[in-house]
Curated annotation (Swiss-Prot):
HAMAP family: LepA
Cellular component GO terms held in the UniProt record: plasma membrane
Identification of the protein by name: Elongation factor 4
Organism: Vibrio cholerae serotype O1 (strain ATCC 39315 / El Tor Inaba N16961)
MF term (GO), any: GTPase activity
PANTHER family: TRANSLATION FACTOR GUF1 HOMOLOG, CHLOROPLASTIC, TRANSLATION FACTOR GUF1-RELATED
Subcellular location: Cell inner membrane
Gene Ontology biological-process annotations: positive regulation of translation
Amino acid sequence: MKHIRNFSIIAHIDHGKSTLSDRLIQVCGGLSDREMAEQVLDSMDLERERGITIKAQSVTLDYTAKDGQTYQLNFIDTPGHVDFAYEVSRSLAACEGALLVVDAGQGVEAQTLANCYTAIEMDLEVVPILNKIDLPAAEPERVAEEIEDIVGIDAIDAVRCSAKTGVGVDEVLEKIVSAIPAPQGDPDAPLQALIIDSWFDNYLGVVSLVRIKNGSLKKNDKIKVMSTGQTWGVDRLGIFTPKQVDTDSLDTGEVGWVVCGIKDIMGAPVGDTLTLAKNGCEKALPGFKKVKPQVYAGLFPVSSDDYDNFRDALGKLSLNDASLFYEPETSAALGFGFRCGFLGMLHMEIIQERLEREYDLDLITTAPTVVYEVLKTNKEIVYVDSPAKLPAINDIEEIREPIARCNILVPADYLGNVITLCIEKRGTQVDMVYHGNQVALTYDIPMAEVVLDFFDRLKSTSRGYASLDYGFQRFEMSHMVRVDVLLNGDKVDALAIITHRDNSQTRGRQLVEKMKEFIPRQMFDIAIQAAIGNHIIARSTVKQLRKNVLAKCYGGDVSRKKKLLKKQKEGKKRMKQIGNVELPQEAFLAILHVGKD
C-alpha cells in the first residue's frame, strides 16, 4: 500500500492537462505507441472537438522509480472549466495529492486558483508544475513568483516541463512519488468504497468508478449500497490502464471500476458508499456536497413521439452527470418536455449536444433563466425557475434575484474595460488587489447577467486574458419583471423572459426585432408584441404576402380597383381569424442572442 499514489491534475482551460496526462501514460507504457491518440482521456467525441475535458477519467499506471521500486499511480483527469467544478471536487475526494499545472507563458488564472483552494481545503498535497516551457513566451521564473504571490504555495523548485515535447516528464513522475503521500486506510477493516463516478453501459448495466478507502473488494463479494440498502453481487471489477482491464480484487487505496449488474439507473448514486453485505462498515463516507443548478431551461422533443426516448436518455445522462437536474414540464406551445437545471451555459450546450448525438434526439430549448426567490403578499416564499411559474403581479411583494460572487483575474492593461463591463452588468465592486502585473477583482454581479453572456464578453474585452470564477452568494431584492411575447394577441409561454425593469424596454424591443427576422412571412400580418402585464412595451409586424390583384386592370375606373382591393382585404381578414403562426426553432433561440450583436 505504501507504493500507491493517488493524484489528480488541476489546471485552467488550455494549460495542458490532457497533453500532460497523455505523456504520463506513454512514459509508463499504459498504451502502445500505436494506440496513443491525442488526448487519450477525452474519450467523448465532443470533448475532442471542443478541446475541453468534460468528464473526469481515471487511469492506473505502473511506474518504476529511480529508487528501483515500482509504484502504482492512480491518476484522475479533471475538467478545467468553471461549469464542471463539481467534477473536480469529486475527483479530488479520491486523491491524496494534486498536480497544479500552470502554463509558463500565461501564468495563474482564476480557475486554477478556485480548484487549487478546493484541493487545499480537502488537505491535499499540491505540487506546482510549470508546463509549456518550450514556448518562446514562457517565463518560468516570473510565473513561479506569481504562484507564490497569488496561490501562496512554495514554487521555487517547481518542476519545469513541456508536455508537448516530453521534456521534464520524468521529473514530474519522480516528484509525484516523493511529494505526494501514500493513502491512509486499514486493509483489515470492513470495506468502505466511495463511488466517484458511474455511467451506464448497455451490456453491463451500471459501471461505477470507486476508490477503496478501507478493506478490500473481491470478485463475487456480496456488497451493499449504503444509501439504498440494496445488496448486489460483484460480477466484474478491475482498473483502467486507459483500457478496461479485469482484475480479481481491489485493495485499500486503489481506484478501479466495479460492475454488479445493477440495471436501475438510480441504483448506485455518485458520492455513495459501498460496503460488504455481511459485517459491513457502520457509517457511510462523507460524500460530496450536492451542487445546485444555476441555470434552468425547458427542453422539448421536436416530435412528441420521442418523449419516452427523451426521458430514458435524460435518466442515463443524469447517472453520468450528477449535477443535471430535471422534472417534467408541459407548455401550451411546445407540448410535453422537461425543465432541466444546469451549472452554466456551457454545461447546458454540452448536455443538449450529448442528447442529440448520443441518443439521436431533436430538441427545442427555451430561454435559460436562473432561480428567483419570490416573497408573496401572504408572506409565503416560493422559488421560481421558469417565467411561467411566476405568480400574478398583484400577489408578489418582492422578487429577489440570485447574486454571484465573481473572482476575476485580469492583466492591469485591460482593467478599465473589465470594470466597465462589470458595471454594465449591474455589478458592485467588493475588492481589488494588485499582484504584480495581474489584478484580482471581486465583484457581486446578478447571476442572470453572469450566465447569459458575461464570460464571452469578458474574454472579448480583455483579448482573452481575463479569467473568471464564480459561485452563488445570496438572494437580493431587485425590480424584476416578466416580459411576455404575444403573437397576434396570443401569449406564447415558451418565449417569456424575466428581466430587470431598467432593461425591460430595450430587451423587449430587441426581442421583438429579433423575432421578426426569424418568423417567415405568411398570408396575413403577424403582430409580434412584448408586454409587461397588460402594458405593451414594443411591437413589430411581419408583413403579409399579397397577390397583386390589380394586375389585370389597365387604365379603367378607380372604383373597379377599390372593389378588388376590398375583396382581397376581406379575404385576408377571414384568413387571420382562423390562421395560426408556425414558429421555427430559430425563433426560440432568438432570445439567447438578444443584445449580442
